[in-house]
């Protein structure tokens, strides 16, 4: 062996290296994705699902913080059958010493989604009720939305709201 490469050999090994690098990135993939926002009125896009935190309210009579969220199941969504199931399992609310999750201080309602599904291209509004949480008394409150809570729970959208942001944005409930 002379230690020299012909142009043809060089191109062949360069192509093989490129294929190997591309193949290894496909095998490892992306392990997680947590989109983060810090203000009300902002949107996150995860798995082609766009979620927007529209408003935060506080119901003092019931000691409940209410998050109004719109969810749009985007075109070409990466979800099975292109329909997105949304219920209490899709959300958590955390704060210092506080957790609301499915079956624990958390309730989700929607005036739009009668069957808890957001079909491809549709937008639905959801109200996430965190019972026992006075967000104005916490330094930081985080709302997390999981488009696929079971299979891909590492892919999520988050709104980390500080006390200062909440003081500016929080309102009293405007509906019954």
Functional labels for PLM-detected ranges:
Residues 57, 71, 83-85, 130-132, ...:
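A mature extracytoplasmic/lumenal domain signature
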Residues 62-66, 140:
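A generic structural signal for beta-strand entry/edge sites
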Residues 65-73:
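Short, well-ordered beta-strand segments enriched in hydrophobic/aromatic residues
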Residues 119-176:
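Surface-exposed edge beta-strand/loop patches
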Residues 1-21, 25:
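N-terminal secretory signal peptides and thylakoid transit peptides that target proteins
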Residues 35-60:
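Low-complexity, acidic Ser/Thr/Pro/Gly-rich terminal tails and inter-domain linkers that flank the onset
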Residues 59, 74-124:
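The feature marks short-to-medium sequence segments in extracytoplasmic or secretory-pathway proteins
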């Amino acid at each position: 062996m002379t230690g020299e490469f012909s142009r043809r050999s060089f191109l062949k090994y360069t192509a093989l290296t490129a294929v190997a690098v591309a193949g290894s990135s496909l095998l490892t993939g992306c392990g997680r994705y947590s989109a983060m926002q810090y203000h009300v009125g902002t949107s996150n896009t995860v798995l082609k699902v766009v979620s927007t935190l529209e408003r935060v309210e506080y119901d003092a009579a019931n000691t409940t913080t209410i998050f109004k969220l719109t969810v749009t199941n985007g075109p070409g969504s990466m979800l099975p059958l292109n329909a997105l199931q949304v219920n209490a399992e899709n959300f958590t609310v955390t704060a210092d010493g506080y957790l609301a999750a499915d079956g624990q201080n958390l309730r989700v309602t929607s005036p739009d989604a009668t069957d808890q599904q957001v079909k491809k291209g549709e937008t639905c509004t959801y109200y996430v009720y965190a019972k026992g949480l006075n967000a104005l008394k916490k330094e930081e409150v985080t709302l997390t939305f999981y488009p696929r809570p079971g299979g891909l729970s590492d892919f999520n959208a988050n709104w980390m709201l500080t006390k200062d942001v909440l003081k500016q944005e929080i309102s009293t409930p405007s509906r019954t």
